[in-house]
UniProtKB/Swiss-Prot annotation:
Keywords: Signal. It comes from Vibrio cholerae serotype O1 (strain ATCC 39315 / El Tor Inaba N16961). This is UPF0319 protein VC_A0026. InterPro entries: UPF0319 (IPR018635). Pfam families: DUF2057.
Length: 211
């Protein structure tokens, strides 16, 4: 093989190895992933899938999420929401999953979820080292702009603030308004879907699948 051909093959192999080095996260339906690295997350998987996937570049990561375990009570589904968690960690070429507390029923969850202990585990089952905090907002919770709140949190240098350059990127006012509207619409959609009976949910699924 000629030297130029060998160099070309070597570069191709290096590029392929670099391109395949990703961080993947398994997102169960009890995790409401709100912000990833300053932006709305792009998850793979269908709307009704119990688990979705998130793919990230290697490096420092920041996630904002809410844990929402649910319980059956007669014909109703009871959802208990945690406070909004913000966490920062480093990851490279890893497969990560949430390790969240399990609750017997809604009353137990209501009592214990405010002090919940959770972890991110890698493919070997080892806990990922991370820094975490709560993203607190007083008053009305519906329609919160989590991207804006996260940016403000990072500017103030909280415990789980990003240290990379993406932490100080400005957010345009129009983007803030659009993000707020989308967040509110999605939150209300999930709220009313979980309140619906089985027949209404079936009609809604049929409608979504036709779009």
């Amino acid at each position: 093989m000629k030297p130029m051909q060998r160099l070309t093959c070597l570069l191709a192999l290096c590029f392929a190895a670099s391109a395949s080095a990703k961080v993947t996260m398994e997102i169960p339906d009890t995790i409401d992933l709100l912000v990833v690295n300053g932006s709305s997350p792009k998850l793979s998987g269908g709307f009704f899938d119990a688990t979705k996937k998130l793919e990230l570049e290697d490096g420092e990561q920041q996630i904002v999420f809410r844990y929402s375990p649910y319980f059956s009570q007669g014909n109703d589904r009871i959802i208990i929401d945690s406070e909004v968690v913000i966490a920062t960690f480093d990851a490279a070429n890893q497969e990560l999953r949430f390790d969240m507390p399990k609750y017997r029923d809604a009353p137990q969850a209501t009592k214990a979820i405010k002090t919940m202990q959770w972890q991110l585990l890698d493919q070997q089952g080892k806990a990922v080292e991370l820094r975490q905090d709560r993203l607190i907002k007083e008053g009305m919770q519906i329609g919160r702009n989590f991207e804006f709140e996260t940016a403000e949190y990072n500017k103030k240098g909280g415990v789980a603030a990003l240290t990379s350059s993406m932490a100080v990127q400005p957010i345009a006012q129009q983007e803030i308004s659009n993000a707020t509207a989308m967040a509110a619409a999605e939150e209300m959609l999930h709220f009313w879907y979980n309140k619906a009976d089985a027949e209404t949910k079936a009609r809604f699924k049929a409608f979504v699948n036709q779009q």
